[in-house]
């Protein structure tokens, strides 16, 4: 059973919520404006300027080249609230009159997150906060090197004692209106790999005097799936996705080389290191057994995204006090988010906010039966306007949980 927040926290929560309600109409308009004018990773300055100009009385500090942060509240310890600035290289197909018209789209909900953080800052400016609140408008979440890596590496937050870093992400796989917190790992570590097999070219009619890299690649592809199913504990989520395979120039030519690339996703650190080593062994043995040579390059990506136990325990009662249901079974996935890097400087909390499609978005009859399956990074993904308020209130609860953490 969730315990009620103490009197002072409950009172501050109520006051913040009142001010938040007043800020929401402008936040909804801002969300549409941001959505209509998306910027790709590394080119987010117009979006950042739009948000910065909507906070005219707050001093902005540039971070990670195209992002910025603002601070309100007392000096000293502060809770950081993160929202992402970048969009995706997609052509939007939502059909709404405020859709983007170019080759970029907010198909991951970042427009919702930005508007929600703006609304929270507007509300928080009007009350006496117990600890500082840093609004971090972060660029380059969708690419590597990521914005979070730049923020952490630059020590831009070192001037303040960071109590916690809080984020929220819309998630269509969570029931609409429900928020999932969940202690421990909630997103996977993700590492990219590229494998090249060097064989010996030849005529397709004479494979015995060539070294064909294609069947070697095929054996590696199936062998990788066996590494997951036969060397990893079955209750440990792990995924190896091979997203690209390249070899050859013509049907009757055995190519000199072939290449494949993909991503390793793991929810346990020991599985991460095991699969790195096992893939290298598998590839080199498969190549050597057939007279070929191999190159294996594994690029370490985002670490596990881990929710701090204390932050979850403090946030859940606040969400409940706001009338927001907390997921009984926490949402976890093998997706990855650069938010995980903030654990290097402070405890972290990522909340997954359940959303549904905006009913105003037209949808074709062919898609009607699969509408509930429209997910992140889809050209028709468009959370309803209610998502802005739900994300903002979730971030508000996360901020107050961080403030309580400072007292413990």
Where are these regions (language model features)?
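Acidic/His- and Gly-rich active-site-bordering loop/insert found
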Residues: 2-107, 111-131
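Divalent metal-coordination and catalytic microenvironments
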Residues: 34, 81, 110, 135, ...
């Amino acid at each position: 059973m969730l315990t009620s927040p103490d009197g002072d926290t409950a009172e501050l929560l109520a006051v913040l919520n009142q001010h938040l309600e007043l800020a929401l109409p402008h936040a909804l308009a801002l969300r549409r404006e941001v959505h209509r004018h998306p910027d790709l990773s590394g080119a987010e300055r117009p979006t950042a300027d739009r948000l910065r100009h909507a906070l005219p009385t707050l001093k902005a500090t540039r971070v990670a080249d195209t992002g910025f942060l603002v601070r309100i509240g007392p000096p000293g310890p502060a809770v950081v609230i993160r929202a992402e600035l970048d969009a995706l290289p997609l052509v939007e197909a939502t059909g709404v009159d405020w859709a983007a018209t170019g080759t970029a789209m907010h198909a991951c909900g970042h427009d919702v997150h930005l508007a929600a953080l703006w609304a929270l800052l507007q509300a928080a400016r009007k009350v006496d906060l117990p600890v500082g609140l840093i609004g971090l408008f972060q660029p380059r979440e969708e690419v590597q090197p990521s914005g979070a890596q730049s923020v952490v590496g630059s020590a831009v937050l070192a001037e303040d004692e960071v109590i916690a870093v809080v984020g929220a992400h819309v998630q269509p796989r969570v029931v609409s209106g429900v928020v999932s917190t969940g202690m421990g790992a909630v997103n996977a570590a993700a590492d990219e790999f590229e494998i090249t097999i060097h064989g010996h070219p030849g005529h397709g009619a004479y494979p015995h005097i060539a070294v064909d890299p294609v069947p070697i690649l095929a054996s590696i592809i199936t062998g990788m799936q066996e590494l997951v199913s036969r060397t990893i504990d079955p209750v440990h989520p792990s995924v190896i996705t091979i997203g690209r395979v390249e070899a050859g120039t013509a049907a009757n030519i055995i190519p000199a080389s072939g290449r494949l690339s993909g991503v390793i996703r793991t929810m346990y650190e020991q599985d991460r290191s095991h699969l790195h080593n096992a893939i290298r062994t598998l590839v080199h043995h498969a190549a050597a057994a057939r007279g070929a040579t191999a190159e294996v390059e594994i690029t370490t990506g985002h670490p596990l995204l881990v929710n701090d136990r204390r932050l979850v325990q403090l946030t859940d009662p606040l969400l409940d006090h706001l009338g927001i249901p907390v997921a009984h079974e926490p949402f976890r996935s093998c997706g990855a988010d650069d938010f995980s890097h903030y654990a290097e400087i402070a405890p972290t909390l990522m909340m997954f906010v359940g959303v549904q499609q905006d009913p105003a978005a037209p949808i074709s009859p062919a898609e009607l039966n699969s509408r509930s399956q429209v997910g992140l990074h889809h050209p028709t993904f468009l959370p309803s306007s209610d998502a802005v308020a739900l994300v903002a209130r979730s971030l508000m609860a996360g901020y107050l949980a961080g403030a309580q953490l400072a007292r413990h």
